[in-house]
Amino acid sequence: MYMTVKQAAEKWGISDRRVRILCSEGKIPGVTREGRSWKIPEDAKKPEDGRYKTTENLLEKIDRKKTELDSRRPLTEGEVERLTEEFVVEYTYNSNAIEGNTLTLRETDMVLRGLTIDKKPLKDHMEAVGHKEAFYFVQDLVKEQVPLSESVIKQIHYLVFADKKDDRGVYRRVSVRIMGAKHEPVQPYLIQPKMEQLLDDYRNSTEHIIPRLARFHIEFEGIHPFIDGNGRTGRLLVNLELMKAGYPPIDIKFTDRIAYYNAFDEYHVKHNLGAMEKLFAGYVNERLDSYLAML
């Protein structure tokens, strides 16, 4: 029995073009060609892709660093509090800026301290405060090791989406489009079953936490379950799961937003998870380095 290039691409999570290249390079045992079509054995294994060895090596480094971090003395309560305060300001600034919030890093810090910025929208103030509250809520979930669920996701969105009370923590009921994106979010009637499937797939996955979360994040944003606030909610979910697994939270920088956007397109157009995986791995690695340098 054979499968087509398209079937192999879907099975292995790569692009049709990449499958054809692997066929032409003789990297798939038993493959044959009939005219312009490739016939691939149904039981063929996905060939190793040397292009992603760098990411695989980085994951190994990350695992070693995490093991080393776990073996060192824990931070004191005061140290943790100080580091969290600093992280929350930058994280709130970057995550909101990616979505169009106009507050600068300094202004975000001031707003989170209870000040009001003249000539800046109330919405921007509320987004900053809501994001901070959502992150501290996520920390509480981590302490209690609360399993990821639709209820948890809706609670986080409720805090994030502070400026639109009627839409907080509620799945959207209208169709939406993401400007400039190469993927169209699902129709409203599909949100519930898609979210259930996403969570089932995530729970049953045996992948390393980083590619596992890279895939979850892209799929979550692709479903786009809420009318707005999906990006901020999605990035908080990534940090919820990273911290539950014993890793430090990451902060995707506003300055890296183009690479971040491109990682979504790479997955939706070419079925290539590598770009998002590499982005996440790089951030986790940097955070581990900063923690190890302190201990």
Predicted regions and their residues:
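FIC/Doc superfamily catalytic core
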Residues: 1-28, 36-228, 232-295
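Double-stranded DNA-binding cores of transcription factors and transposases
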Residues: 32
